[in-house]
């Protein structure tokens, strides 16, 4: 009989613009929640700069201190050198797993042999792509929101055929 693993609950990153104080309050509440894994970071727009990289890292440390697994979410589209600099700080944080929402982040993690979560913004629609990401260090995949249940079932069958599930 196969051993079943306990299901883990994840809380995704806040996708709306909230003030730094509101985010801090939210994540303090999340620390006391039943969520096992908490994703945090600016994943939508770098122009929303009320919360800086250092602030996100401080919140991540606080959450980790309360027993949560923390994943730092990254931008879905890197457009400026300032955004690249911030991404480097995330990649080089030394403590937390990253959610790669851009292939540039995948590359940065792979170059450093760092594990990463493939975020829903990556265009990953088949098992061959998942196998490539696995070889680059992916430890978890978040399915793109536009995919259906039937697509997922088919993809899981492809993964079984490739021996990567």
Positions of PLM-derived features:
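Catalytic domains of carbohydrate-active enzymes, especially glycoside hydrolases
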Residues: 24-44, 136
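Active-site mouth loops of central-metabolism enzymes
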Residues: 5-25, 49-50, 75-78, 115-124
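A general structural detector for well-ordered alpha-helical segments in enzyme core domains, enriched
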Residues: 26, 55-59, 86-90, 105, ...
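Glycine-rich, proline-tolerant flexible connector loops at the mouths of alpha/beta enzymes
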Residues: 36-59, 74-79
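Short, acidic/polar
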Residues: 19-31, 82-87, 124-131
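Catalytic alpha/beta core domains of metabolic enzymes, predominantly
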Residues: 104-106, 115-165
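Alpha-helix-loop-beta-strand connector modules within alpha/beta enzyme cores
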Residues: 53-73, 109-112, 155-165
């Amino acid at each position: 009989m196969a051993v079943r693993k306990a299901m883990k609950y994840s809380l995704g990153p806040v996708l709306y613009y909230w003030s730094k104080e509101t985010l801090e309050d939210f994540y303090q509440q999340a620390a006391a929640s039943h969520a096992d894994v908490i994703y945090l970071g600016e994943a939508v727009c770098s122009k929303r700069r009320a919360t800086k990289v250092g602030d996100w890292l401080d919140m991540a440390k606080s959450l980790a201190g309360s027993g949560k697994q923390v994943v730092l979410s990254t931008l879905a589209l890197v457009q400026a050198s300032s955004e690249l600099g911030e991404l480097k700080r995330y990649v080089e944080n030394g403590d937390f797993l990253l959610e790669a929402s851009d292939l540039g982040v995948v590359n940065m993690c792979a170059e450093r042999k760092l594990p990463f979560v493939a975020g829903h913004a990556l265009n990953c629609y088949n098992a061959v792509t998942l196998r490539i990401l696995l070889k680059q260090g992916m430890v978890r995949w978040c399915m793109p929101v536009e995919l259906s249940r039937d697509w997922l079932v088919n993809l899981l069958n492809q993964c079984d055929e490739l021996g990567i599930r």
